[in-house]
Amino acid sequence: MHAEFRTDRGRIRHHNEDNGGVFENKDNQPIVIVADGMGGHRAGDVASEMAVRLLSDAWKETTALLTAEEIETWLRKEIQEVNKQIVLYAESEMDLNGMGTTLVAAIMAKSQVVIANVGDSRGYLLQNNTLRQLTEDHSLVHELLRTGEISKEDAMNHPRKNILLRALGVEGKVEVDTFVVPFQTTDTLLLCSDGLTNMVPETEMEDILKSKRSLSEKADVFITKANSYGGEDNITVLLVERNLMQKGRDAS
């Protein structure tokens, strides 16, 4: 597997509340994670850092999970535990009240990939030169779009597009979505925060992934492109290919 991770403050925000990286368990099986924190007074970066650290620490203590069913069970259980720990920590620190974070994570299983998500950080797959979104946003705007109350055009600039219906650290229990999809050697997996998807149209995202650039160059282009469109939020990108037994960079 080859993975490339990038995170950038963007052009507007004063600090970066995104987090993520590539982490391995005892049998060198990787998990890839992206989290986008929320909350005032830097509480968002506390929440996203906790989510990534707690989930990756739990993963580092496991041995290989070979089936999609095993991975789904593990992700649901551990993300629930991460949520519980963030809630407890926020309750113990007054200045962290109201903090939370999105989370999207993926683990490879033979010829498949298992993805889990909470919030509006997304997972995409480029397969057969076509980009498709694997995850569903847990947001007010997505719900309005799903029920036909607004159009896709309305959704792009909706004044309440940042309101989440699900996030880690908000309630004692959280519903976690999981998806199992084929993952071939010619495919590319993309995990990202909304700082990318709110800035760069999906047609351009697809073109970048289809280009002849290296995986590292593609990750850099995503950051550059989001900033060129305004960089209104923190931008995080994690790209994965399974055709190279090579590990990319972790979060710094």
Curated annotation (Swiss-Prot):
<feature type="domain" description="PPM-type phosphatase">
    <location>
        <begin position="2"/>
        <end position="242"/>
    </location>
</feature>
<dbReference type="InterPro" id="IPR015655">
    <property type="entry name" value="PP2C"/>
</dbReference>
<feature type="region of interest" description="Disordered">
    <location>
        <begin position="1"/>
        <end position="23"/>
    </location>
</feature>
<keyword id="KW-0963">Cytoplasm</keyword>
<feature type="binding site">
    <location>
        <position position="36"/>
    </location>
    <ligand>
        <name>Mn(2+) 1</name>
    </ligand>
</feature>
<keyword id="KW-0464">Manganese</keyword>
<keyword id="KW-0378">Hydrolase</keyword>
<feature type="compositionally biased region" description="Basic and acidic residues">
    <location>
        <begin position="1"/>
        <end position="18"/>
    </location>
</feature>
<dbReference type="InterPro" id="IPR001932">
    <property type="entry name" value="PPM-type_phosphatase-like_dom"/>
</dbReference>
<keyword id="KW-0904">Protein phosphatase</keyword>
<dbReference type="GO" id="GO:0004722">
    <property type="term" value="F:protein serine/threonine phosphatase activity"/>
</dbReference>
<feature type="binding site">
    <location>
        <position position="36"/>
    </location>
    <ligand>
        <name>Mn(2+) 2</name>
    </ligand>
</feature>
<dbReference type="InterPro" id="IPR036457">
    <property type="entry name" value="PPM-type-like_dom_sf"/>
</dbReference>
<dbReference type="GO" id="GO:0005737">
    <property type="term" value="C:cytoplasm"/>
</dbReference>
<comment type="similarity">
    <text>Belongs to the PP2C family.</text>
</comment>
<feature type="binding site">
    <location>
        <position position="194"/>
    </location>
    <ligand>
        <name>Mn(2+) 2</name>
    </ligand>
</feature>
<dbReference type="GO" id="GO:0016020">
    <property type="term" value="C:membrane"/>
</dbReference>
<dbReference type="GO" id="GO:0046872">
    <property type="term" value="F:metal ion binding"/>
</dbReference>
<dbReference type="Pfam" id="PF13672">
    <property type="entry name" value="PP2C_2"/>
</dbReference>
<keyword id="KW-0472">Membrane</keyword>
<keyword id="KW-0479">Metal-binding</keyword>
<protein>
    <recommendedName>
        <fullName>Serine/threonine phosphatase stp</fullName>
        <ecNumber>3.1.3.16</ecNumber>
    </recommendedName>
</protein>
<comment type="function">
    <text>Protein phosphatase that dephosphorylates EF-Tu.</text>
</comment>
<feature type="binding site">
    <location>
        <position position="233"/>
    </location>
    <ligand>
        <name>Mn(2+) 2</name>
    </ligand>
</feature>
<feature type="binding site">
    <location>
        <position position="37"/>
    </location>
    <ligand>
        <name>Mn(2+) 1</name>
    </ligand>
</feature>
